[in-house]
């Protein structure tokens, strides 16, 4: 197994950085910038697989299912990060998108020895969440071979949940354990084996697509505005009011009035103005349209 790991692209040495310790600060920064430019290129061939994965996630959401990210180390932390951002950005409940990391919450800041090597822990974490066939599980592993993730994917398959894998090596082992496999290969790292670099960036870019596009497709967005944002601080209140301006064409003062009248709900404010209806009528329309602004506006 040790020799197998050493053959992975993510573990390889990058010839461009062989003399890294002798390079100037600027030269290293330039090299890292050049290498980072390869990340988006590595994702392009996988866009069809990414789209297929998003379709599974959307189906799960429409069945009141959840999106669960599973990973260890950097991969796990990225999953937790993306899940956490869905709450303020799209107004989701914390349970709707969750990130699980091998070793539990403490592993976000401190390495938990051996946690990623036990496939049973991955399965147990999903059992503890009471995973159902309506859920979607995304297994994250830059190496493509993390036992914790494989155990989770196998359990999810057994339950009947949608399964997606994301790895940064070709022919990854976890690809054999998922319904949809995504393999992005940005190549060896500037610092050999440090997958928090290009591999981590690639994973985050894919996660951005999975969560954002899924939310677009379940009506969390109107045009390109995040109209389900939760205005939990001053910045977000300002953003919410501005979105009402942009969506309706009203003045800043009128947007503020709509925002207040709609109980600080951007969607309700937009429907009130564009459909010319009361707060209660706008709320009823949105309820009938399952929260989709365009559909609510089309109702009579």
From Swiss-Prot:
- One Pfam family per UniProt: GKRP_SIS_N
List the HAMAP family. MurQ
The UniProt record lists the keyword Lyase: yes
Role summary: Specifically catalyzes the cleavage of the D-lactyl ether substituent of MurNAc 6-phosphate, producing GlcNAc 6-phosphate and D-lactate.
* Species assigned in the record: Lactiplantibacillus plantarum (strain ATCC BAA-793 / NCIMB 8826 / WCFS1) (Lactobacillus plantarum)
Query: What is this enzyme's class at the first EC digit?
Result: lyase
Q: In what residue span(s) does the SIS domain sit?
A: 57-220
Concerning NCBIfam families, the annotation shows: N-acetylmuramic acid 6-phosphate etherase (TIGR00274), PRK05441.1 (NF003915), PRK12570.1 (NF009222)
MF terms from GO for this chain are: carbohydrate derivative binding; carbon-oxygen lyase activity; ether hydrolase activity
Its taxonomic placement starts with: Bacteria, Bacillati, Bacillota, Bacilli, Lactobacillales
Gene3D superfamilies xref list: 1.10.8.1080, Glucose-6-phosphate isomerase like protein, domain 1 (3.40.50.10490)
Catalytic reaction annotation: N-acetyl-D-muramate 6-phosphate + H2O = N-acetyl-D-glucosamine 6-phosphate + (R)-lactate
Against SUPFAM superfamilies, the record matches this protein to: SIS domain (SSF53697)
Pathway assigned to this chain's UniProt record: Amino-sugar metabolism; N-acetylmuramate degradation
Q: What is this protein called?
A: N-acetylmuramic acid 6-phosphate etherase 1
């Amino acid at each position: 197994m040790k020799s197998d790991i050493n053959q992975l692209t993510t573990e390889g040495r990058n010839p461009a950085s062989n003399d890294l310790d002798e390079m100037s600060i600027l030269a290293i920064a330039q090299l890292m910038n050049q290498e980072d430019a390869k990340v988006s290129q590595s994702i392009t061939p996988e866009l069809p697989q990414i789209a297929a994965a998003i379709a599974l996630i959307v189906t799960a959401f429409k069945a009141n299912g959840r999106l669960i990210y599973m990973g260890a180390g950097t991969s796990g932390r990225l999953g937790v990060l993306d899940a956490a951002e869905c709450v303020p950005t799209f107004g989701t409940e914390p349970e709707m998108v969750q990130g699980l990391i091998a070793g539990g919450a403490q592993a976000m800041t401190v390495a938990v020895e051996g946690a990623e090597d036990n496939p049973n822990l991955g399965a147990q974490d999903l059992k503890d969440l009471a995973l159902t066939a309506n859920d979607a599980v995304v297994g994250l592993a830059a190496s493509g071979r993390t036992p914790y993730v494989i155990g989770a994917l196998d359990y999810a398959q057994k339950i009947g949940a949608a399964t997606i894998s994301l790895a940064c090596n070709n022919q990854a082992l976890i690809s054999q354990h998922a319904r949809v496999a995504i393999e992005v290969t940005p190549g060896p790292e500037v610092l050999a084996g440090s997958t928090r670099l290009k591999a981590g960036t690639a994973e985050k870019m894919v996660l951005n697509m999975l969560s954002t596009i899924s939310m677009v497709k379940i009506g969390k967005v109107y045009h390109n505005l995040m109209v389900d944002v939760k205005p939990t601080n001053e910045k977000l209140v300002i953003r919410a009011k501005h979105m009402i301006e942009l969506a309706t064409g009203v003045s800043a003062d009128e947007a503020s009035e709509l925002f207040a009248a709609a109980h600080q709900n951007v969607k309700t404010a937009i429907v009130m103005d564009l459909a010319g209806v009361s707060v209660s009528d706008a709320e009823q329309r949105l309820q009938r349209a399952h929260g989709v602004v365009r559909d609510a506006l089309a109702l009579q």
